[in-house]
């Protein structure tokens, strides 16, 4: 699949979608995007910047949701024009899709909305690349039906994203078999290594997380075989306004990506999956 100027697929080099969970400020967005662009250029990893202008599914009414549509979209436009990177953001049922599509390069649908047929089809009808997150409640083989709804709009630029599955209350686990199963859709499969260590709503009205397990799960996913890696990162995760406990420190990204790139190259050299 052609994606933001590069080829994405199981037999292609690993690409990265990364950035802070939510837009906190223009300064932070430009800083992180610039840092990640330079890092990925050095490592020769295709890169898409991500951040959200509105986190509509925060656990608490008092949690920070973002700068809002107009200001957030303006910041994403500056990231794209000033830093020179493609950008991804998530959209919701009440998002003005035409306005967002005029700025961003990739649309993302939240995991909680993956079963909303009208929503999935409206997003796919924008004819932009779409990263569809698999719901925490959904079996991997059910994603073929979600993908079919999107592709019924004539859009073949669809990705399937694994972000963990509910395991009891306030806990997620990653079943690596799901990556293999979702590849059967024919779409590039993306692994979200940061939300997969989230402890949803498990910290007194806010989500906790176990970021120490991010490297292990990311390496496992790359070894199984994926097209892209999704990671939320922040210069100071403990002070992040959203999803800090499951965000990876920005200054540790390069070391981790170096190991993942090496693992990806080994998998794609010796794999019999394609």
UniProtKB/Swiss-Prot annotation:
It catalyses: D-arabinose 5-phosphate + phosphoenolpyruvate + H2O = 3-deoxy-alpha-D-manno-2-octulosonate-8-phosphate + phosphate. GO terms for molecular function: 3-deoxy-8-phosphooctulonate synthase activity. GO terms for biological process: keto-3-deoxy-D-manno-octulosonic acid biosynthetic process. The keyword Disulfide bond does not apply. Pathway: Carbohydrate biosynthesis; 3-deoxy-D-manno-octulosonate biosynthesis; 3-deoxy-D-manno-octulosonate from D-ribulose 5-phosphate: step 2/3; Bacterial outer membrane biogenesis; lipopolysaccharide biosynthesis. Keywords: Cytoplasm, Lipopolysaccharide biosynthesis, Transferase. Pfam families: DAHP_synth_1 (PF00793). Its EC number is 2.5.1.55. It is found in: Cytoplasm. The keyword Oxidoreductase does not apply. GO terms for cellular component: cytoplasm. Signal peptide: none annotated. Belongs to the KdsA family. This is 2-dehydro-3-deoxyphosphooctonate aldolase. It comes from Legionella pneumophila subsp. pneumophila (strain Philadelphia 1 / ATCC 33152 / DSM 7513).
């Amino acid at each position: 699949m052609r994606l933001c100027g590069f080829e994405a697929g199981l037999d292609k080099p690993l690409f990265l979608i990364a950035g802070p969970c939510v837009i906190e400020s223009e300064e932070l967005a430009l800083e992180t995007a610039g840092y990640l662009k330079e890092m990925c250029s050095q490592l020769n990893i295709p890169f898409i910047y991500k951040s959200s202008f509105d986190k509509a599914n925060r656990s608490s009414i008092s949690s920070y949701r973002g700068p809002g549509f107009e200001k957030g979209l303006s910041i994403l436009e500056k990231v794209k024009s000033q830093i020179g990177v493609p950008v991804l953001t998530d959209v919701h049922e009440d998002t003005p899709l035409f306005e967002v599509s005029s700025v961003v390069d990739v649309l993302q649908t939240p995991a909680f909305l993956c079963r909303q047929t009208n929503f999935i089809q409206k997003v796919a009808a924008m004819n932009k690349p779409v990263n569809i997150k698999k719901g925490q409640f959904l079996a991997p083989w059910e994603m073929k039906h979600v993908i079919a709804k999107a592709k019924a709009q004539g859009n073949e630029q669809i990705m399937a994203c694994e972000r963990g599955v509910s395991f009891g209350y306030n806990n997620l686990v990653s079943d690596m078999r799901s990556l293999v199963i979702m590849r059967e859709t024919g779409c590039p499969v993306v692994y979200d290594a940061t939300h997969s260590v989230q402890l949803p709503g498990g910290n007194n009205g806010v989500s906790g997380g176990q970021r120490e397990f991010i490297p292990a799960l990311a390496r496992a996913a790359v070894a199984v075989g994926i097209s892209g890696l999704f990671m939320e990162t922040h210069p100071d995760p403990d002070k992040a306004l959203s999803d800090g406990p499951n965000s990876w420190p920005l200054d540790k990204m390069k070391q981790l990506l170096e190991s993942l790139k090496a693992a990806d190259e080994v998998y794609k050299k010796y794999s019999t999956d394609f």
